[in-house]
Swiss-Prot record:
It is a lipid-anchor. This is Lipoprotein YfjS. One of its GO terms (cellular component) is plasma membrane. A lipid is attached at residue 21 (S-diacylglycerol cysteine). It comes from the Bacteria. InterPro entries: YfjS_YafY_dom (IPR046809). Its main location: membrane. Coiled coil: none annotated. Residues 1-20 form the signal peptide. The gene is yfjS. The keyword Phosphoprotein does not apply. It comes from Escherichia coli (strain K12). Does not induce degP when overexpressed unless it is mutated to resemble YafY. To E.coli YafY. Keywords: Cell inner membrane, Cell membrane, Lipoprotein, Membrane, Palmitate, Signal.
């Protein structure tokens, strides 16, 4: 019984791993078709899963995955040892760089969270390092996403 179970478990684990790789590749293909809000275009920097070095995701209670931050392996022009960071809004189908002209070294880790303005109800995405706010980015709605 044990001899039959072990190969079956290995087969299941391998197929799950391979399907997860396919899902990530499919996710990147879908994201590359999202509306780019500001340059540089996501598809110009990321073409395959190996181009992404780190991912951060926020999951909504009702809608599932809502926001993702993707840290790329490519450095902006004139920035040695830095990375591009992209904010992906899965709900609105938009993508935009977190920092267009800011060079962040690879050893700096950012923390992220979403904030809603209590008066205007606009959504913002804040990123910080060591508890210090580094930036705030408006999360706009995408009119192309409306049916």
């Amino acid at each position: 019984m044990k001899r039959k179970t072990l190969p079956l478990l290995a087969l299941v684990a391998t197929s799950l791993f391979l399907s997860a790789c396919d899902d990530r590749s499919d996710d990147l293909k879908a994201i590359s078709k999202f509306k780019d809000l500001t340059p540089p275009r996501f598809s110009d920097v990321v073409s395959r899963q190996d181009d992404v070095s780190e991912e951060w995701s926020q999951v909504g209670f009702s809608s599932g995955l809502t926001l993702q931050v993707l840290r790329t392996r490519e450095s902006p022009d004139g920035c040695e040892g830095g990375s591009y960071y992209y904010l992906v809004d899965m709900e609105e189908k938009t993508v935009q760089p977190l920092m267009n002209a800011l060079c962040i070294a690879d050893n700096i880790k950012l923390e992220y969270h979403e904030v809603t303005d209590p008066y205007t109800k606009e959504k913002y995405f804040e990123y910080s390092h060591d508890g210090k706010l580094m930036g705030r980015l408006l999360i706009p709605s995408n009119p192309d996403n409306r049916e």
